[in-house]
Design a protein with these regions (language model features):
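Intrinsically disordered, low-complexity regions enriched in acidic/Ser/Thr/Pro/Gln residues
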Residues: 1-79
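Buried hydrophobic positions in well-ordered alpha/beta secondary-structure cores of metabolic enzymes
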Residues: 16, 108, 166-168
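General beta-strand structural signal in soluble alpha/beta enzymes
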Residues: 25-28, 86-88, 116-120, 136, ...
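Short coil/turn connectors at secondary-structure junctions
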Residues: 44-45, 80-83, 111-114, 129-132, ...
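Extracellular/luminal Protease-associated
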Residues: 74-118
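Ligand/cofactor pocket segment of small-molecule handling proteins
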Residues: 105-144
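Acidic, glycine-rich flexible loop/linker segments
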Residues: 137-173
Length: 173
């Protein structure tokens, strides 16, 4: 894993095309990301997926939301190492709820994740867990009404659908 972290994602894409003997590899995200630590090595690991939302308050009972959140943490704790948390924000371009910040980077690092990729915003730049990069669609100040909607059912981020166990190589590209 150490060697893979030392190269950037465009190099990985090129290597895959060489190995396939043709151009046209397209298993990568589209769009522009914000990287919490753009000069850090790449994030390499196996996907652990979830979907979140937060623009509006959840309509389910608080005990249901709380139980799902605990199931989410158990899900992130499981799986092969190293792990990358991948969260799709179902609010899309209107996403305002930053799941990823100081608290969640610290918690997920403790669960064995080495980084996160999200279609939603991140926050608490400068206060995130050291060595836990987040690659997000945007930066925002609030967690709003963020809550977990699905766990382990896949997550689509910038046009690429991730499934649990997918091998990920990600950086500021």
């Amino acid at each position: 894993w150490t060697k893979l972290r030392e190269i950037d994602t465009p190099t990985v894409c090129n290597a895959i095309e060489v190995a396939q003997g043709k151009r046209g590899f397209d298993a990568f995200t589209r769009g522009t990301f914000q990287a919490s630590a753009p000069n850090d090595p790449a994030v390499v690991g196996f996907a652990r997926t979830a979907q979140i939302a937060g623009k509006e308050p959840p309509t389910e009972a608080p005990d249901v939301i709380r139980a799902r959140r605990m199931d989410y943490f158990r899900h992130m704790d499981a799986g092969d190492l190293p792990k990358v948390a991948v969260t799709e924000d179902l609010d899309g371009s209107e996403a305002v709820s930053a799941w990823w910040g100081e608290v969640h980077t610290t918690v997920h690092k403790g669960l064995g994740c080495v980084g996160a990729i999200t279609s939603g915003p991140m926050r608490d730049l400068g206060d995130m867990a050291e060595g836990f990069p987040v690659i997000a669609s945007s930066i925002g100040p609030s967690h709003a009404f963020v809550h977990v909607r699905t766990i382990g059912a896949g997550a689509t981020v910038h046009g690429l659908t991730f499934q649990d166990g997918d091998l990920i190589h990600a950086d500021r590209h």
